[in-house]
Amino acid sequence: MKVLIAGDSWGCGCWDKIGNTHRGLELFLQMKGHIVTNLSVCGYSNTEIYRSLKTVDLSEFDYVFAFYTNPFRDIISDNLYSKYFDVPDYTITYKDVLKMYDELWCNSYLMFDSLNYPIHMIGGHHKLEEIESTKNLISFIPSIREMFYKDYVQPKIVYISTVFKNYLKKFDRDTIDFLYETYNVYLNLQNIQQEYFYPDGYHLNAKGHLILSGRIEEFMK
């Protein structure tokens, strides 16, 4: 099969001891005889993942898989929501965060759907919302963490340091507490995810990528 993978660091693979990635997912699929093109880049936002997919002819591939990342990354990549972050003395509330989140994930699905080709979505850094209303998006794995840990429920809104850390003074206290609470949920998972996840508690290790590649290969049979 000709397989296309797009995403952020979750699509790249897992880290070795010196900080490089071995691109495990594509490697394991190649070992099974598949021809794999991997467009994933660490730190990519959903918009950047979408743009990477636009650089290739999707019809040349039998299957296209895209890792869905934290929608708040688009605040940085496209300088969105300056009305909240750049206005002096404006305090961002939890209501604002919810509004931004709903707009961001909805817009990202519309982007991916506009490619007019079946995209098998994988919830990596962020869990997928319902996508039944789209024409071309398939919810292949809504949440990798929930796939490995059946008792775990991934939070809807997740603190992401590259976005929120530089803007903490803009949030009210209740919103800051909420964001850190979701972050602590991730940190607490580090103690139980060691079998399949890298020590950072976020990314799959080689064993996790091997299982994920097996799930993908089984689906493509």
Regions found by a protein language model. Give the residues of each.
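Metal-dependent catalytic neighborhoods of phosphoester/phosphodiester hydrolases
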Residues: 47-55
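Alpha-helical cap/lid subdomain in secreted, periplasmic
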Residues: 54-206, 210, 214-221
